[in-house]
Swiss-Prot record:
Region (Small ATPAse domain (RuvB-S)): 186-255
Binding site for Mg(2+): 70
Region annotation (Head domain (RuvB-H)) ranges: 258-347
Localization terms from the record: Cytoplasm
Catalytic activity line of the entry: ATP + H2O = ADP + phosphate + H(+)
Enzyme Commission identifier(s): 3.6.4.-
GO CC terms in record: cytoplasm; Holliday junction resolvase complex
Record text about domains: Has 3 domains, the large (RuvB-L) and small ATPase (RuvB-S) domains and the C-terminal head (RuvB-H) domain. The head domain binds DNA, while the ATPase domains jointly bind ATP, ADP or are empty depending on the state of the subunit in the translocation cycle. During a single DNA translocation step the structure of each domain remains the same, but their relative positions change.
Function summary: The RuvA-RuvB-RuvC complex processes Holliday junction (HJ) DNA during genetic recombination and DNA repair, while the RuvA-RuvB complex plays an important role in the rescue of blocked DNA replication forks via replication fork reversal (RFR). RuvA specifically binds to HJ cruciform DNA, conferring on it an open structure. The RuvB hexamer acts as an ATP-dependent pump, pulling dsDNA into and through the RuvAB complex. RuvB forms 2 homohexamers on either side of HJ DNA bound by 1 or 2 RuvA tetramers; 4 subunits per hexamer contact DNA at a time.
GO biological process, one term: DNA repair
Protein name: Holliday junction branch migration complex subunit RuvB
Paired cysteines (S-S): none
Length: 347
């Protein structure tokens, strides 16, 4: 992890992938595809702030990875005509990290903190006062002789992003003037995202092929753009057309099936079906069985599997649905494997 609190964690993304995604990012709300309600709400918030010549209210963006939280933060800065400062929760592990970051902001600057729920508790508590009154208290000295010195801050707009809004303490959540939950995209919206990306990349691909990619990208624009890149590479190397046959061949090569399931999705489902006889199984046990972090399974894999009806989350643990058994051509046991989904999680 970087010692610089302004450097976001990007452990799972290569520099080339980041450059590719950055080139495709929309710069305005008008260019942003999907999330129509959120776009309308943000447009109103930003327009009102400009008309009143003030900084925009603090904004919290929640939702699964890859739906556009970072892009929307960049758009907020661009449409506010203000600079953007990037940071992340894991990079802010001490109150001093946050104090240094906040005290260096210029008037009206937009501060984006990704994965804000992973920020240290001492930093969270300092952020309360900063968001509300644009000041922080700096402790000087130790023990009984310690004194608090107030430090005024330049007015700023905080944009926080989280994949797990339930982990945010209520005092922090309540200080955001606007909160939005980003939803998964439908196939029509994803086809628009892909068509825009293809034009920007000067990549000729037919509509049927785009629709096929849209159906396999888990409702997530980031995945859609990455799959488009894989199809483009395949067409380039094999010297053929970027048609539906090329899509099938490329995605089969990269283990993305017709539902959009990838290697990890299938590993999770196979573990539940075969090792645990359909479940229920706890999150930590499941994570160990597939060699993955529990947080990755909970925030990346499960939302998609639950949404397409292959997995249920119950008070006792994760359970494979009848549809999951059928998808893999297996006969479901008679009892206990078709419980309705639950928002409750196991410990």
């Amino acid at each position: 992890m970087s010692d610089d609190p302004t450097t976001p964690e990007l452990e799972s993304e290569s520099e080339s992938e980041l450059a590719f995604e950055g080139a495709l990012r929309p710069r305005t709300l008008a260019e942003f595809v999907g999330q129509a309600k959120v776009r309308g709400q943000l447009q109103l918030l930003l327009t009102a702030a400009r008309m009143q010549e003030r900084t925009a209210d603090h904004i919290l963006l929640a939702g699964p990875p890859g739906l556009g939280k970072t892009t929307l933060a960049m758009i907020v800065a661009h449409e506010s005509d203000r600079p953007l400062r990037l940071s992340s929760g894991p990079a802010i592990q001490h109150a001093g990290d946050l104090a240094a970051l906040l005290s260096s902001l210029t008037p009206g600057e937009v501060l984006f903190i990704d994965e804000i729920h992973r920020m240290a508790r001492t930093a969270e508590e300092m952020l309360y006062l900063a968001m509300e009154d644009f000041r922080i208290d700096i402790m000087v000295g130790k023990g009984a002789g310690a004194t608090s010195i107030p430090l005024d801050l330049a007015p700023f707009t905080l944009v926080g992003a989280t994949t797990r809004s339930g982990l945010l303490p209520n005092p922090l959540r309540d200080r955001f003037g606007f909160t939005a939950h980003l939803e998964f995209y439908d196939e029509g919206e994803l086809a628009q995202v892909l068509a825009r990306a293809a034009v920007m990349l000067e990549f000729e691909i037919d509509g049927e092929a785009l629709a096929e990619i849209a159906g396999r990208c888990r409702g997530t624009p980031r995945i859609a753009n990455r799959l488009l890149r894989r199809v483009r590479d395949y067409a380039l190397v094999h010297g053929g057309r970027a048609d539906i046959a090329a899509v099938h061949a490329a995605l089969e090569l990269y283990d993305v099936n017709e539902l959009g399931l990838d290697r990890l999705d299938r590993a999770v489902l196979h573990a539940i079906l075969e090792r645990f006889e359909g479940g229920p199984v706890g999150l930590n046990t499941l994570a160990v069985s597939v060699g993955e972090e529990p947080e990755t399974i909970e925030s990346v894999v499960e939302p998609f599997l639950v949404r397409i009806g292959l997995l249920s989350r119950t008070p006792r643990g994760r359970v494979a649905t009848v549809a999951a058994w059928r998808h893999f051509g297996l006969a479901a046991p008679r009892q206990g494997h078709s419980q309705p989904p639950s928002l409750m999680d196991d410990l």
